[in-house]
């Protein structure tokens, strides 16, 4: 079990940029059938990332970061009610809310995600049963229990899906308020973490509190990195070849306006454009080749509203 987990970590971190690039490429696929297939492939990968963190690190250590499973553990301890029955009932109700407030497409994605996660966890429990924790370092395992599910959740949120449970409430709050996803998750999960102090003791409660706060930060950080774009302000003498490259090779557009140097009083052209990180590298290299004296300002932005970007 440990060797497979380590192999997964190596593959994931080694291919992080390609994974994030694949997420962005999914949003740009024009064919609706191919885009849908790519989205469900991403959902599958995201769920598996979450399952690894939950099964190998969260469950063996009894970490509770909120969510339906956190509430289920608390309710089961307090009332004796079967935790699985409680989880199923609450998830069913939340799925109905998802269909009502978020639309059919999100609801179908969430049903698929929930079923895949349940099946994957059951399969691991049957074929790779965990006799105990992987290491004797709870803080180390807490990091992976936070990091992997948070990455999976962030990817799901970014393509308009969720793994079910309280993620649905977070998406509803995000859709109908100004809250970001991480803050919304913190709000809906904090109650069960507070209850864990009284039910499972201060040690578990403190670990769970730390995990919950870190999870919301990781989710927002991953979403921001997925959506990260580069904004260019290019001050040049000959804008035509640069604009042709932006339009024809990068399939982007740009805005051009005239300017004047404050010191030289020479006329200049300013090109303003925005694109994905992989395209930004190509544009920067091209400008250096065709006009080495051009002055280039490059800045980051993760929230862009307009055609061709996520925040339409």
Regions found by a protein language model. Give the residues of each.
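Alpha-helical interaction segments
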Residues: 1-2, 30
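Compositionally biased, low-complexity peptide segments typical
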Residues: 16-23
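Hydrophobic alpha-helical signal peptides and transmembrane signal-/tail-anchor segments
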Residues: 2-14
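Core subunits and conserved enzymes of cellular information-processing
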Residues: 24-238
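Peripheral (non-transmembrane) domains and long loops of multi-pass membrane proteins
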Residues: 24-29, 226-312
């Amino acid at each position: 079990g440990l060797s497979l987990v380590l192999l997964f970590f190596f593959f994931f971190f080694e291919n992080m940029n390609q994974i994030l690039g694949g997420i962005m490429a999914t949003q740009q696929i024009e064919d609706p059938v191919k885009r849908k297939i790519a989205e469900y492939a991403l959902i599958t990968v995201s769920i598996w990332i979450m399952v690894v963190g939950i099964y190998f690190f969260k469950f063996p250590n009894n970490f509770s970061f909120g969510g339906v499973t956190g509430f289920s553990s608390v309710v089961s301890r307090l009332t004796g009610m079967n935790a699985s029955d409680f989880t199923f009932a609450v998830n069913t109700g939340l799925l109905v809310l998802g269909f009502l407030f978020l639309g059919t497409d999100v609801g179908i994605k969430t049903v698929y995600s929930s079923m895949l996660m349940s099946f994957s966890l059951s399969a691991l429990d049957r074929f790779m049963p965990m006799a105990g924790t992987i290491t004797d370092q709870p803080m180390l395992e807490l990091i992976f229990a936070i990091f992997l599910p948070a990455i999976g959740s962030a990817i799901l949120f970014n393509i308009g899906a969720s793994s079910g449970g309280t993620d649905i409430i977070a998406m509803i709050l995000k859709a109908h308020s100004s809250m970001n996803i991480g803050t919304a998750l913190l709000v809906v999960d904090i109650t069960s973490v507070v209850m864990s102090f009284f039910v499972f003791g201060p040690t578990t409660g403190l670990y769970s509190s730390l995990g919950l706060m870190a999870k919301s930060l990781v989710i927002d950080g991953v979403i921001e990195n997925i959506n990260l774009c580069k904004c260019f302000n290019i001050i040049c003498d000959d804008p035509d070849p640069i604009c042709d490259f932006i339009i024809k090779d990068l399939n982007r557009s740009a805005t051009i306006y005239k300017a004047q140097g404050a010191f030289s009083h020479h006329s200049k052209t300013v090109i303003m454009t925005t694109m994905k990180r992989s395209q930004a590298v190509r544009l920067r290299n091209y400008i250096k080749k065709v006009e080495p004296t051009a002055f280039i300002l490059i800045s980051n932005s993760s929230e862009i509203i307009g055609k061709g970007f996520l925040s339409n």
